[in-house]
UniProtKB/Swiss-Prot annotation:
Modified residues (N-acetylalanine): 2
Biased composition (Low complexity): 1-10
Ranges per topology, Cytoplasmic: 2-148, 209-214, 264-274
Similarity field: Belongs to the YIP1 family.
Post-translational modification: N-glycosylated in the ER (40 kDa form I), then O-glycosylated in the Golgi apparatus (46 kDa form II), the C-terminal lumenal region is later removed in the Golgi apparatus to produce a 36 kDa form III. O-glycosylated with core 1-like and core 2-like glycans. O-glycan heterogeneity at Thr-346: HexNAc (minor), HexHexNAc (major), Hex1HexNAc2 (minor), Hex2HexNAc2 (minor) and dHex1Hex2HexNAc2 (minor).
Protein species of origin: Homo sapiens (Human)
Name recorded for this polypeptide: Protein YIPF3
Gene Ontology terms: cellular component: Golgi apparatus; intracellular membrane-bounded organelle; plasma membrane; transport vesicle
Subunit: Interacts with YIPF4 and YIPF5.
Role summary: Involved in the maintenance of the Golgi structure. May play a role in hematopoiesis.
Tissue/organ expression: Expressed by nucleated hematopoietic cells (at protein level).
PANTHER family xref list: NATURAL KILLER CELL-SPECIFIC ANTIGEN KLIP1 (PTHR15627), PROTEIN YIPF3 (PTHR15627:SF14)
Main location per the UniProt record: membrane
Localization (cell): Cell membrane; Cytoplasm; Golgi apparatus, cis-Golgi network membrane
Length: 350
């Protein structure tokens, strides 16, 4: 038994030639198992490669579909021709109209929202406006402390429009035929130009003179100061007397000017500053009333002559009888009358 086992063991160790092929197969099988164990696990990367490949295929399909759609649209546009161009143009016009309507709606909404900003400046009772109109004609005496100025624009704005209407009424009653648009524009430009321009100029001087007044207060003060101008022009446009105009110019216009001057004096420190500021305001305010009474008609008549030409009646030659007594020449009147008539007939024939 022992002797039999030894050759078997020796044969397993490679001593016997008959076991050579079997041992090679076993060794080959062992190397195969070891190689499989030592191989990298590439199964995950293989799935990732498949996913990327699938994604590329889908992208290529999408690009192909987009190219086909573009080609189809191009073919349709070429096939439709002018019809396709009109359709595209109509879409663009509709888009532009929509955008324009949207912008207008937003502007209207913003304008309505901005009305609330101006509402405090026009929120005033009629009784307050009436009392302020009367106070604008009464000069104040106490100028030691700053006088109160109404911070609203309803009364001044209505007075400016009233002055425009009075100017139009004056031109209606002056037997002057003009074009309504030209007259309206001239009157509005004159009144609003004076109100806004002089208020800005006086406010600038007040800033230089260190006066305690704001632009809103200056507009209100000068606007209520036009109440005297409205009274004077309304009366003198209906009663054409220069003496009456000068009387109202000094009394009514002077009272309204003194009221404004007193308010500015109470808000200005220093005699030189008071003289400069108040003297400028008084001169501009009184001269503006003179301008409205005298120069305004000439301006409108000049516009009328420019638009329609001067209205000059034609010259007519009419023979007249010479008076019976001529101190310079002692000639018979019958001879002179006959001679004059003959000359007139000769001129008319030519």
């Amino acid at each position: 038994m022992a002797t039999t086992a030894a050759p078997a063991g020796g044969a397993r160790n490679g001593a016997g030639p008959e076991w050579g092929g079997f041992e090679e197969n076993i060794q080959g099988g062992g190397s195969a198992v070891i190689d499989m164990e030592n191989m990298d696990d590439t199964s995950g990367s293989s799935f990732e490669d498949m996913g990327e490949l699938h994604q590329r295929l889908r992208e290529e399909e999408v690009d192909a579909d987009a190219a086909d759609a573009a080609a189809a649209e191009e073919e349709d546009g070429e096939f439709l021709g002018m019809k396709g161009f009109k359709g595209q143009l109509s879409r663009q016009v509709a888009d532009q109209m929509w955008q324009a309507g949207k912008r207008q709606a937003s502007r209207a909404f913003s304008l309505y929202a901005n009305i609330d900003i101006l509402r405090p400046y026009f929120d005033v009772e009629p009784a307050q406006v009436r009392s302020r109109l009367l106070e604008s004609m009464i000069p104040i005496k106490m100028v030691n402390f700053p006088q109160k100025i109404a911070g609203e624009l309803y009364g001044p704005l209505m007075l400016v429009f009233t002055l425009v209407a009075i100017l139009l009424h004056g031109m209606k009653t002056s037997d002057t035929i003009i074009r309504e648009g030209t007259l309206m524009g001239t009157a509005i430009g004159t009144c609003f130009g004076y109100w806004l321009g002089v208020s800005s100029f006086i406010y600038f001087l007040a800033y230089l003179c260190n006066a305690q007044i704001t632009m809103l207060q200056m507009l209100a003060l000068l606007g209520y100061g036009l109440f005297g101008h409205c009274i004077v022009l309304f009366i003198t446009y209906n009663i054409h007397l220069h003496a009456l105009f000068y009387l109202f110019w000094l009394l009514v216009g002077g009272l309204s000017t003194l009221r404004m001057v007193a308010v500015l004096v109470s808000r200005t420190v220093g005699p030189t500053q008071r003289l400069l500021l108040c003297g400028t305001l008084a001169a501009l305010h009184m001269l503006f009333l003179l301008y409205l009474h005298f120069a305004y008609h000439k301006v409108v008549e000049g516009i009328l002559d420019t638009l329609e030409g001067p209205n000059i009646p034609p010259i007519q030659r009419v023979p007249r009888d010479i008076p019976a007594m001529l101190p310079a020449a002692r000639l018979p009147t019958t001879v002179l009358n006959a001679t004059a008539k003959a000359v007139a007939v000769t001129l008319q024939s030519h």
